[in-house]
């Protein structure tokens, strides 16, 4: 079936919103099961067929994105991804303070902006009633019916002044474009509504001639419409296939963009842990296509898409109400999913420093050459104006740089490491690299993983690269790579709930990365062999990447025989052949010793190679 037809009929939403309201159900359990059997991405638990109520059914399914919505809840759901929000008042965004109502910003179309109220003003009274200290009751004084008026007393620079303002309906768009720092095009997007792609395009066209870099702020953006995210991406990258969806049957669909790019400039993309779903699809696609420098913390990790059944496509079941269910996993332009793992920023920095670092790497075309520092990382040249960048911002940048980063002064010839550049500039910072890796042939891979928070040492900076790895430990390593939430559901008799690795083992088992020994036990304290680890890693690669998953189905008998001839057990041959074909083994296939204990440094190197090959860690 044509993808556009599917999406038109069912409305695929990429949202991280969950409605937790008490609902009167009109849909029957039998009808819900029919819809789940038809479209649900995962296999339904056997217990689902014993459910007597919808509430019980959805609890058994255990998917926060699969649920029933009453008519009121459905309307609220649809409103949550609209391109605009309407509020009634004088057109200000505010903060309550002990000194009055602080005007954080004035809104376009509001009477406050037209009358000359400014950000930073304090509203101390409304119609003569004091707003000091400010609270909800103070706010109630300035809102009211459209067309009515209110006189606000404003304190500015020690002087008071009165403004008589009309209360109006003010429309707040979910996407706004402006120019900051005199040369950066800034797009702030809180969600992807139906026309957000058009808003991106219009904003870029409006100011592109006067900027040399774009900054797209997706912090707190929980998602929206898939096609809108693709259209927004297309405004930067132009035509092509930018997103893939795969259903439970393995059928693949795609989203394409068919216009030229509206800008030649690269975008710096701000993200945080609340950046989810469609916004992750945007960020991941920009990363894969070489047009997005992602800055911030690792994103939420919602790489699944939902469809909505309502009266438009199932009139026999619904009358104003609806049911949303997970139907697809989505993959970025390069074939990687962000489901669970999230999008890993090129520059992983704290939320507190993310915006400052993002603006810093946008450079400054007016700076003197002597004040510029260049960072080469992940295929990008990041230009930093040292004269405008605070020392703590530089420290946050240096902490985020992996071993592959190269730095130099714009008018200099010497290429430096982050440590050397920081020393030259007199900036102190806390490196994330591990102290005992210098003699390891895999030092760069280990320290890259450490930079991105994927491996940890012992808390004192040591990794012990030459030591072996236990089965419980590898679950923690893979769990951190995937950004898994630990699970309390006990899967093995010998993994007690109180063990430090228990949550990781349970989570890895639920995802199918690890299996027990067939006797109900996992043997978490046993040393892991090379073939055991590579089997686990091959499952991870298949989960993360379309390319690895398809390659696994294409492995020939000749490849399996070659692995067996090297000493791999039959259950390990496919995994070894897959990783060998993907060129992600820590050593040539013929040099491996399948039954030997794998070393921590070897495990880290192959993990880095997989994350790099699938595009999640492109450094």
In which residue ranges do the predicted regions lie?
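Terminal peptide-recognition signature
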Residues: 32, 53, 92, 112, ...
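PDZ domains, with a preference for the canonical peptide-binding region formed by the helix
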Residues: 122-153, 201, 228, 302-313, ...
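Hydrophobic core
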Residues: 15-19, 23
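N-terminal propeptides
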Residues: 410-619
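Interdomain regulatory linker/hinge segments that flank or connect interaction modules
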Residues: 27-82, 151, 156-158
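PDZ-domain C-terminal substructure recognizer with occasional recognition of PDZ-binding tails
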Residues: 101-102, 124, 137-177, 326-327
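C-terminal "post-core" interaction segments
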Residues: 179-215, 219-430
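PDZ/PDZ-like domain segments forming the peptide/carboxylate-binding groove
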Residues: 27, 83-133, 194
């Amino acid at each position: 079936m044509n993808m556009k037809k599917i999406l038109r009929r069912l409305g695929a939403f990429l949202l991280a919103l969950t409605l937790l309201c008490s609902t009167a159900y009109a849909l029957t359990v039998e009808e819900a099961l029919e819809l789940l059997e038809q479209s649900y991405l995962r296999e339904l638990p056997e217990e689902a067929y014993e459910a007597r109520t919808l509430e019980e059914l959805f609890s058994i399914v255990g998917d926060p994105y699969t649920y029933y919505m009453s008519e009121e809840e459905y309307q609220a759901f649809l409103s949550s991804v609209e391109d605009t929000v309407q509020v009634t008042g004088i057109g200000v965004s505010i903060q309550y303070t002990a000194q009055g109502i602080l005007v954080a910003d004035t809104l376009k179309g509001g009477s406050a902006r037209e009358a000359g109220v400014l950000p930073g003003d304090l509203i101390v009274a409304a119609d003569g009633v004091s707003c000091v200290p400010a609270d909800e009751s103070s706010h109630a004084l300035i809102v009211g019916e459209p067309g009515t008026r209110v006189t606000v007393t404003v304190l500015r620079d020690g002087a008071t002044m009165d403004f008589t303002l009309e209360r109006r309906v003010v429309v707040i768009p979910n996407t706004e474009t402006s120019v900051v720092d005199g040369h950066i095009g800034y797009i702030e997007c809180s969600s992807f509504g139906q026309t957000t792609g058009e808003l991106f395009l219009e904003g870029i066209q409006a100011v592109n001639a006067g900027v040399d870099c774009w900054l797209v702020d997706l912090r707190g953006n929980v998602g929206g419409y898939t096609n809108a995210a693709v259209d927004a991406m297309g405004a930067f990258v132009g035509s092509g296939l930018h997103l893939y969806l795969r259903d439970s049957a393995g059928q693949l669909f795609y989203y394409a963009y068919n216009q030229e790019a509206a800008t030649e400039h690269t975008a710096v993309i701000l993200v945080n842990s609340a950046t989810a779903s469609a916004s992750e699809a945007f960020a991941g696609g920009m990363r894969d296509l070489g047009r997005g420098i992602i800055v911030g913390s690792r994103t939420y990790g919602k790489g699944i898409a939902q469809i909505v059944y309502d009266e438009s496509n199932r009139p026999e079941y619904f009358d104003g109400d609806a049911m949303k269910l997970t139907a697809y996993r989505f993959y970025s332009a390069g074939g990687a999913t962000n489901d669970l793992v999230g999008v890993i920023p090129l520059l992983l920095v704290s939320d507190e420093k993310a915006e400052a670092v993002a603006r810093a790497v946008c450079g400054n075309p007016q700076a003197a050459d002597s004040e510029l520092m260049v960072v080469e990382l992940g295929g990008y040249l990041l230009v930093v104006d040292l004269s405008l960048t605070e020392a703590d911002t530089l420290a946050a940048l240096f902490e985020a740089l992996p071993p592959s980063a190269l730095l130099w002064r714009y008018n200099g010839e010497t290429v430096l490491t982050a440590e050397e550049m920081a020393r030259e500039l007199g900036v102190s910072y806390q490196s994330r690299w591990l102290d005992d890796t210098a003699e390891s042939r895999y030092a760069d891979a280990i320290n890259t993983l450490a930079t991105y928070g994927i491996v940890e040492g012992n808390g004192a900076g040591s990794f012990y690269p030459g030591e072996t790895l236990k089965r419980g430990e590898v679950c923690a390593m893979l769990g951190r790579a995937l950004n898994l939430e630990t699970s309390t559901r006990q899967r093995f008799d010998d993994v007690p709930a109180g063990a430090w690795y228990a949550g990781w083992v349970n989570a890895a088992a639920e995802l199918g990365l690890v299996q027990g020994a067939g006797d109900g036990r996992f043997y978490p304290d046993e040393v892991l062999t090379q073939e055991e680890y590579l089997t686990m890693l091959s499952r991870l690669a298949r989960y993360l990447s379309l390319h690895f998953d398809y390659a696994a189905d294409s492995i020939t008998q000749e490849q399996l025989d070659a692995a067996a001839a090297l000493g791999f057990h039959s259950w390990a041959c496919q995994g070894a052949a897959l990783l060998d074909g993907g060129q992600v083994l820590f050593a040539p296939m013929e040099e491996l010793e399948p039954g030997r204990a794998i070393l921590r440094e070897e495990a880290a190197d192959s993990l880095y190679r997989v994350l790099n090959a699938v595009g999640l860690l492109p450094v």
